[in-house]
Amino acid sequence: RVMSNITDTDGKVVSAVIRVGRNGDYENLDALVMDATNNLIDEVYQDDPKLVAIVGRKLLADKYFPLVNKPQENSEALAADIIISQKRIGNLPAVRVPYFPANAVLVTTLENLSIYFMDESHRRSIDENPKKDRVENYESMNIDYVVEAYAAGCLLENITLGDFTA
């Protein structure tokens, strides 16, 4: 359930990236996320009210920057502030995650993502290092990040925003 390029009905790659913008594969991020929700997520999960669009800071900024990057009347500035404060992409709440890839969107529920810790895997060693006048702490732990139900989510990657007029 990963969309990283655009293919035709025969499965032939039309575009190596997902082009979002004028004359692209999608006109805006909202259309891309709505299409992915309707076609890549199993029908059972499509209407789940807990679905969110997990994005990095850059995609969110690229969506909302044009709203604020122009001189505006007070009423228009207030409307832009309200739109930005809602942070929605494709009619889903947008969740900004640090260190998430800049050109990707993950559509799923937050409950579908889990962290597992292996029992008794936490290892720790504390060494005193008088040569450097410090105490050195070494720690390691076996941690696994899991998507519980692949049918309840999809990943959109290789998203390129721009104007694709020839």
Sequence positions of predicted segments:
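Short, catalytically relevant binding-site loops at active-site mouths
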Residues: 8, 58-62, 149
